[in-house]
Protein backbone atom coordinates (compact mmCIF):
# COMPACT_ATOMS: atom_id res chain seq x y z
CA UNK A 1 0.00 0.00 0.00
CA UNK A 2 1.56 3.27 -1.07
CA UNK A 3 1.16 6.83 0.16
CA UNK A 4 0.17 9.05 -2.79
CA UNK A 5 2.00 12.27 -3.71
CA UNK A 6 0.70 15.68 -4.77
CA UNK A 7 0.95 14.88 -8.51
CA UNK A 8 -1.36 11.83 -8.12
CA UNK A 9 -3.84 13.77 -5.94
CA UNK A 10 -3.92 16.60 -8.48
CA UNK A 11 -4.42 14.25 -11.45
CA UNK A 12 -7.18 12.25 -9.73
CA UNK A 13 -8.97 15.43 -8.68
CA UNK A 14 -8.74 17.34 -11.96
CA UNK A 15 -9.32 14.37 -14.30
CA UNK A 16 -11.62 12.17 -12.19
CA UNK A 17 -13.29 14.55 -9.71
CA UNK A 18 -11.82 12.90 -6.59
CA UNK A 19 -11.89 16.25 -4.71
CA UNK A 20 -14.21 19.08 -5.73
CA UNK A 21 -13.69 22.00 -5.47
CA UNK A 22 -9.96 21.37 -5.73
CA UNK A 23 -7.29 23.91 -4.75
CA UNK A 24 -4.07 23.14 -6.68
CA UNK A 25 -1.76 24.85 -4.21
CA UNK A 26 -1.71 25.38 -0.49
CA UNK A 27 -3.36 28.62 0.64
CA UNK A 28 -2.05 29.79 3.98
CA UNK A 29 -1.74 33.55 4.23
CA UNK A 30 -4.01 34.99 6.95
CA UNK A 31 -6.01 31.73 7.08
CA UNK A 32 -5.65 28.26 8.53
CA UNK A 33 -4.08 26.54 5.54
CA UNK A 34 -5.95 24.42 3.01
CA UNK A 35 -5.35 22.89 -0.40
CA UNK A 36 -2.80 20.54 -1.95
CA UNK A 37 0.30 19.62 0.06
CA UNK A 38 3.24 17.30 -0.65
CA UNK A 39 1.53 14.04 0.35
CA UNK A 40 -1.99 15.09 1.21
CA UNK A 41 -4.79 17.59 0.89
CA UNK A 42 -5.88 20.03 3.61
CA UNK A 43 -9.68 20.14 3.69
CA UNK A 44 -11.86 23.09 4.70
CA UNK A 45 -14.72 23.13 7.16
CA UNK A 46 -17.99 24.68 5.98
CA UNK A 47 -20.00 27.31 7.86
CA UNK A 48 -22.72 25.01 9.22
CA UNK A 49 -22.17 23.42 12.64
CA UNK A 50 -24.25 21.24 14.95
CA UNK A 51 -23.43 21.84 18.60
CA UNK A 52 -24.30 19.03 21.00
CA UNK A 53 -26.10 20.28 24.11
CA UNK A 54 -27.61 18.77 27.22
CA UNK A 55 -31.32 19.00 26.40
CA UNK A 56 -31.49 15.24 26.87
CA UNK A 57 -29.37 13.38 29.39
CA UNK A 58 -28.08 10.68 27.04
CA UNK A 59 -26.45 10.31 23.63
CA UNK A 60 -27.40 6.99 22.05
CA UNK A 61 -25.60 6.24 18.76
CA UNK A 62 -28.19 3.53 17.94
CA UNK A 63 -31.12 5.86 18.49
CA UNK A 64 -29.79 9.39 18.11
CA UNK A 65 -32.20 12.16 19.03
CA UNK A 66 -31.64 15.16 16.69
CA UNK A 67 -32.85 17.40 19.53
CA UNK A 68 -29.48 16.72 21.21
CA UNK A 69 -27.82 19.11 18.75
CA UNK A 70 -28.48 22.70 17.70
CA UNK A 71 -27.71 23.94 14.17
CA UNK A 72 -25.55 27.04 13.98
CA UNK A 73 -24.80 29.02 10.82
CA UNK A 74 -21.40 30.72 11.05
CA UNK A 75 -21.41 32.19 7.53
CA UNK A 76 -22.00 35.77 8.71
CA UNK A 77 -19.37 35.81 11.48
CA UNK A 78 -16.84 33.63 9.64
CA UNK A 79 -16.23 31.51 12.72
CA UNK A 80 -18.02 29.30 15.22
CA UNK A 81 -17.48 29.47 18.98
CA UNK A 82 -17.10 25.96 20.38
CA UNK A 83 -17.79 26.14 24.12
CA UNK A 84 -15.37 24.70 26.67
CA UNK A 85 -15.42 20.89 26.85
CA UNK A 86 -17.99 20.78 24.04
CA UNK A 87 -18.50 18.73 20.88
CA UNK A 88 -19.82 19.71 17.46
CA UNK A 89 -20.27 18.28 13.99
CA UNK A 90 -19.53 20.10 10.75
CA UNK A 91 -18.91 19.16 7.12
CA UNK A 92 -16.31 19.78 4.47
CA UNK A 93 -16.58 22.25 1.63
CA UNK A 94 -15.00 19.58 -0.57
CA UNK A 95 -16.95 16.69 -2.09
CA UNK A 96 -15.06 13.39 -2.42
CA UNK A 97 -15.29 10.55 -4.96
CA UNK A 98 -12.86 7.90 -3.78
CA UNK A 99 -11.28 5.47 -6.29
CA UNK A 100 -12.00 1.76 -5.71
CA UNK A 101 -8.34 0.98 -4.94
CA UNK A 102 -7.76 3.85 -2.49
CA UNK A 103 -8.44 4.54 1.19
CA UNK A 104 -7.99 7.99 2.73
CA UNK A 105 -7.16 8.82 6.33
CA UNK A 106 -7.91 12.23 7.82
CA UNK A 107 -5.89 13.83 10.62
CA UNK A 108 -6.54 17.08 12.47
CA UNK A 109 -4.37 20.12 11.76
CA UNK A 110 -1.66 20.97 14.28
CA UNK A 111 -2.84 24.61 14.46
CA UNK A 112 -6.08 23.45 16.10
CA UNK A 113 -4.49 20.57 18.06
CA UNK A 114 -2.11 23.04 19.73
CA UNK A 115 -5.19 24.93 20.95
CA UNK A 116 -6.83 21.81 22.40
CA UNK A 117 -9.22 21.38 19.45
CA UNK A 118 -9.34 17.75 18.36
CA UNK A 119 -10.69 16.85 14.91
CA UNK A 120 -11.78 13.30 14.16
CA UNK A 121 -12.91 11.83 10.85
CA UNK A 122 -13.20 8.14 10.07
CA UNK A 123 -11.43 6.73 6.97
CA UNK A 124 -12.80 7.51 3.51
CA UNK A 125 -13.40 4.02 2.18
CA UNK A 126 -12.92 2.83 -1.42
CA UNK A 127 -15.68 4.28 -3.67
CA UNK A 128 -17.13 6.42 -0.88
CA UNK A 129 -18.76 9.50 -2.37
CA UNK A 130 -20.04 12.57 -0.54
CA UNK A 131 -19.18 15.45 1.74
CA UNK A 132 -17.29 14.51 4.89
CA UNK A 133 -18.89 14.93 8.31
CA UNK A 134 -16.27 16.25 10.73
CA UNK A 135 -16.27 15.68 14.50
CA UNK A 136 -14.75 18.53 16.53
CA UNK A 137 -14.01 18.46 20.29
CA UNK A 138 -12.84 21.30 22.49
CA UNK A 139 -10.77 19.63 25.21
CA UNK A 140 -9.98 22.90 27.01
CA UNK A 141 -11.86 24.74 29.74
CA UNK A 142 -12.09 27.83 27.49
CA UNK A 143 -14.33 28.61 24.50
CA UNK A 144 -12.52 28.30 21.16
CA UNK A 145 -12.98 29.69 17.65
CA UNK A 146 -13.28 27.33 14.68
CA UNK A 147 -12.91 29.29 11.43
CA UNK A 148 -15.46 28.55 8.70
CA UNK A 149 -14.20 28.07 5.13
CA UNK A 150 -10.62 27.51 6.31
CA UNK A 151 -8.45 24.43 6.86
CA UNK A 152 -9.49 21.93 9.54
CA UNK A 153 -7.70 18.64 8.73
CA UNK A 154 -5.36 16.89 6.31
CA UNK A 155 -6.32 13.88 4.19
CA UNK A 156 -3.67 11.36 3.09
CA UNK A 157 -4.37 8.80 0.37
CA UNK A 158 -3.25 5.18 0.47
CA UNK A 159 -3.52 3.11 -2.71
CA UNK A 160 -3.91 -0.64 -2.20
CA UNK A 161 -1.57 -3.21 -3.73
CA UNK A 162 -4.63 -4.92 -5.19
CA UNK A 163 -8.27 -4.03 -5.84
CA UNK A 164 -10.71 -4.73 -3.00
CA UNK A 165 -13.45 -7.26 -3.71
CA UNK A 166 -16.21 -5.10 -2.26
CA UNK A 167 -16.14 -1.32 -1.93
CA UNK A 168 -18.18 0.98 0.30
CA UNK A 169 -20.44 1.67 -2.69
CA UNK A 170 -20.81 -2.05 -3.50
CA UNK A 171 -22.08 -2.84 -0.01
CA UNK A 172 -24.44 0.17 0.06
CA UNK A 173 -22.61 2.13 2.77
CA UNK A 174 -25.04 4.04 4.97
CA UNK A 175 -23.30 7.39 4.51
CA UNK A 176 -22.85 7.07 0.73
CA UNK A 177 -23.78 10.33 -1.04
CA UNK A 178 -24.14 12.31 2.18
CA UNK A 179 -24.72 16.04 1.85
CA UNK A 180 -24.14 18.46 4.71
CA UNK A 181 -23.85 17.26 8.29
CA UNK A 182 -25.03 13.67 8.65
CA UNK A 183 -26.06 12.45 12.11
CA UNK A 184 -25.37 8.88 13.32
CA UNK A 185 -27.27 6.14 11.46
CA UNK A 186 -27.91 2.47 12.13
CA UNK A 187 -29.08 0.28 9.25
CA UNK A 188 -32.33 -1.50 10.07
From Swiss-Prot:
Biological process per Gene Ontology, one example term: dUTP biosynthetic process
Sequence intervals crossing the membrane: none
| Database matches in SUPFAM superfamilies | dUTPase-like (SSF51283)
Give the source's domain of life in one word.
Bacteria
Q: Which reaction does it catalyse?
A: dCTP + H2O + H(+) = dUTP + NH4(+)
UniProt xrefs under HAMAP family: dCTP_deaminase
Protein known as = dCTP deaminase
The species is Helicobacter pylori (strain ATCC 700392 / 26695)
Amino acid sequence: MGLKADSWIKKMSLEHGMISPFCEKQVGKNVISYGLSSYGYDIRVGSEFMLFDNKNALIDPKNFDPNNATKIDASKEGYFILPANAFALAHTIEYFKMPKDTLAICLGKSTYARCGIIVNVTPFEPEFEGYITIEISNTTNLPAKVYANEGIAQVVFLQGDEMCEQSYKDRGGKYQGQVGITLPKILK
